[in-house]
Amino acid sequence: MIEWIIRRSVANRFLVLMGALFLSIWGTWTIINTPVDALPDLSDVQVIIKTSYPGQAPQIVENQVTYPLTTTMLSVPGAKTVRGFSQFGDSYVYVIFEDGTDPYWARSRVLEYLNQVQGKLPAGVSAELGPDATGVGWIYEYALVDRSGKHDLADLRSLQDWFLKYELKTIPDVAEVASVGGVVKEYQVVIDPQRLAQYGISLAEVKSALDASNQEAGGSSIELAEAEYMVRASGYLQTLDDFNHIVLKASENGVPVYLRDVAKVQIGPEMRRGIAELNGEGEVAGGVVILRSGKNAREVIAAVKDKLETLKSSLPEGVEIVTTYDRSQLIDRAIDNLSGKLLEEFIVVAVVCALFLWHVRSALVAIISLPLGLCIAFIVMHFQGLNANIMSLGGIAIAVGAMVDAAIVMIENAHKRLEEWQHQHPDATLDNKTRWQVITDASVEVGPALFISLLIITLSFIPIFTLEGQEGRLFGPLAFTKTYAMAGAALLAIVVIPILMGYWIRGKIPPESSNPLNRFLIRVYHPLLLKVLHWPKTTLLVAALSVLTVLWPLNKVGGEFLPQINEGDLLYMPSTLPGISAAEAASMLQKTDKLIMSVPEVARVFGKTGKAETATDSAPLEMVETTIQLKPQEQWRPGMTMDKIIEELDNTVRLPGLANLWVPPIRNRIDMLSTGIKSPIGIKVSGTVLADIDAMAEQIEEVARTVPGVASALAERLEGGRYINVEINREKAARYGMTVADVQLFVTSAVGGAMVGETVEGIARYPINLRYPQSWRDSPQALRQLPILTPMKQQITLADVADIKVSTGPSMLKTENARPTSWIYIDARDRDMVSVVHDLQKAIAEKVQLKPGTSVAFSGQFELLERANHKLKLMVPMTLMIIFVLLYLAFRRVGEALLIISSVPFALVGGIWLLWWMGFHLSVATGTGFIALAGVAAEFGVVMLMYLRHAIEAVPSLNNPQTFSEQKLDEALYHGAVLRVRPKAMTVAVIIAGLLPILWGTGAGSEVMSRIAAPMIGGMITAPLLSLFIIPAAYKLMWLHRHRVRK
């Protein structure tokens, strides 16, 4: 089949070249127009349900809202995890779906089930779907600053809410623009309880009057002078004077009682659950641009910047927009870095080809397969919808060296055959027809084996395709692009390369012996191979012993899920204890931001505590997320690295009650979306009794702090909230004609504040809040004395119908699949994650006694690593079986297929030792490198075995037991190995040359790519030894055994 394709391609070379030209043009177009991003979209398919229940405590929110929602969502088809968050006034439910679920199908199914449960929610409470986005979509953040002092926080927040937000939402693929920080303006109706009692007016009557006085109505239309006039009756509250003139009732003598008679109306701040701060200089308002899932971040950010630049002239005097996070900077750095590495690889590979072949046009034949293979890969990427990012470009980068292997072997074989023809016909001139025949025969001779070897490299990545979840989405693009590049190279090797050789390998072909590099290789390899053939069993014994040496470095390298990617920015997310007030949170935020700004490498600090106004942010008030923008690396102090900056930041920011955590922004949001855990290692304690869960979590926290490598450990306190319980006495309430609902309504309105509508001021809307004065509700004793007007117009106090007690309770409730859960956040430093987790598991098993009904599970990145390892342990053996079948089909001998498969472990030895030497940990990235190495090692074995078989087949006497001799066998093996050392050395050299820029490179994405490249480069030391020495020795023993059997 392969032979037929080669011959037909050469026969129709004009059409093939036209096809290659078309591919190059099409590929160039796709390269220019392929969307770019820093990382693949790693988000799980997620639907968020947000429900506001203002003023309600977390336990009430959990019982009345979150629990009905989570238990219902467990039945949604395709849902794998349902997480619930109940906090003060808000419920968040995150429904995580199985991989491959269409996000809009998921939203429709959640909406369907939401309709079923809506009737079980409290009156007036409505659950809403969040945007079709996730926390990973936070691509651009900005702050509004007024350095002139003309505008306060309320003005800045109004500018954000009613101007900037709507302008930015018009940009395509912006799912949401979330406001954060500042102060929301609120009209506050502060009731005087004594005056209210004096006039005999209840709180409910005031609420009703406010609602009735803030409306507009239409009166249809009338016709005047042949024109139509529409009638409207204005009634919106727009000024404080409008509020003061609201009539509550009329006295017996007809004198009206106005709102101003019983209340003070003022403009003040709405209760805050989110605070923003800039550079330690004070509070600001800001916004977060959230990208719609699966869309092009770079294009959207560019559009956002253009829009903000346009809007600058419309801003009030003194107000400026300060960019506090811009993901496009990371995208540009990552793409520029990988594109530069690809160019470096192309140049180095070209130089290596020219040095070995000693013939410029022959080198060009090999080099041209690189851009053509790149075009093929990008064309398939375009149809699949893959964007260009660190991982997809990285797949092409690690394939570059192997892509030219087939071309190199074909060119070298063509050189050999042309040289032999000249030797056989010293007086003849090679005509065009004969040249094409020689080159076609040379291609056919090695083409099938080369195609199989490239197919093996392609199939070696099957285990990566089977990875699930976040790890599958991360490494899938790399596996796809490497596969496309290698498949393209395999196709080019049998279709285009033979034609290019026919056109370009012309003129005088320098003999191999004329190249000093080739002479040096033969001079070194010749005596060594003779010794190997003389002692083949000893050679195999040494190889087996060398494989055993990897046991020592394997015990030292440790393990992790992924190395931390340097995104150029940092996220400071300290864990704090619950129950902090808004004022204390703002003070703490400013202190930490000021300390962070003191580090010279920091350019800007945008601190946030609490949540932004979006369903994608469920942060409680005590949760800090500070975005740190670093200066360009060339402006750092000499010798500073990201690790050293983090260490200095950690030593600088030391405040009581804070457990520091420094993480990359994108990586952290991905982890929180996938597992819910913001730290690299997390432990989830689940159960039914909150006190038992809390006690166990605190025990685990104490145990974790004793484990080597644990930098910080903090357990969430479920019972850390402070409560004032109003325990209604039903019997006493009944004596005054009041029901439990009446008392609860009074507490909700007088203490919590009742929202009684909003003002309409152009496009702006501001809330109206009704409540008692602060002095009447600032202590338990004050609450007891709150006056109540009963339905029977009796004056009583709250203490007459309820007991007021101070207690503790949950500040926030988390559930996973409807089970209450407490999370312990653990940050590990100076030690690999796997070793830390193993010691943690051992320590918890020995020192923590599980309570009945509780369970402990490790989460975070460790959970992802365990899942990836489980999948790879299953799929790697299956892939080896597939490769074995291909080898059998190529050689038609079980022994030869087994020889190549069994020798692959020897090739991995160098990779493991290089990992240890460079201080890298085993991870999914290094595992990917080892899988790629195994494919290349199998290719080396196939090529060597092909040459050895050709050499032996050229000596017919070796197949005859009567004429067989070990000396003749050694001579044949010598010809197959030593005289073909050039192509084997070239394949090794181009792969190493292609990978070195990746290994030693810096910049965005280099952390992952260097760990993929390291095993491959280390393996390129032992894999050639496998090909050059072990396979000839083993093949000799196989032939000797075959000869004995024949005799």
UniProtKB/Swiss-Prot annotation:
Annotated phenotype, changing residue 755 to I: Slight decrease in copper resistance
Statement: the UniProt record of this protein carries the keyword Iron: no
Subcellular location: Cell inner membrane
Residue ranges of the TM segments: 14-34, 338-358, 363-383, 391-411, 446-466, 485-505, 532-552, 871-891, 898-918, 928-948, 985-1005, 1012-1032
Annotated effect of mutating residue 623 to I: Loss of copper resistance
Keyword Cytoplasm assigned: no
InterPro entries linked: AcrB_DN_DC_subdom, Acrflvin-R, CusA-like
Record-linked Gene3D superfamilies: Multidrug efflux transporter AcrB pore domain, Multidrug efflux transporter AcrB pore domain like, Multidrug efflux transporter AcrB TolC docking domain, DN and DC subdomains, Multidrug efflux transporter AcrB transmembrane domain
Topology relative to the membrane: Multi-pass membrane protein
GO molecular function, one term: copper ion transmembrane transporter activity
Keywords: Cell inner membrane, Cell membrane, Copper, Copper transport, Ion transport, Membrane, Transmembrane, Transmembrane helix, Transport
GO biological process: copper ion export; copper ion transmembrane transport; detoxification of copper ion; intracellular copper ion homeostasis; plasma membrane copper ion transport; response to copper ion; response to silver ion; response to toxic substance
Mutagenesis / variant outcome for changing residue 399 to D: Strong decrease in copper resistance
A cellular component annotation (GO) from this entry: membrane
Known outcome of mutating residue 640 to I: No change in copper resistance
Induction context: Transcriptionally regulated by CusR in response to copper and silver ions.
Record family assignment: Belongs to the resistance-nodulation-cell division (RND) (TC 2.A.6) family.
Additional record remark: The cus system plays an important role in copper tolerance under anaerobic growth and, under extreme copper stress, in aerobic growth.
Subunit annotation: The cus efflux system is composed of CusA, CusB, CusC and CusF.
Protein role: Part of a cation efflux system that mediates resistance to copper and silver.
Record-given protein name: Cation efflux system protein CusA
Organism per entry: Escherichia coli (strain K12)
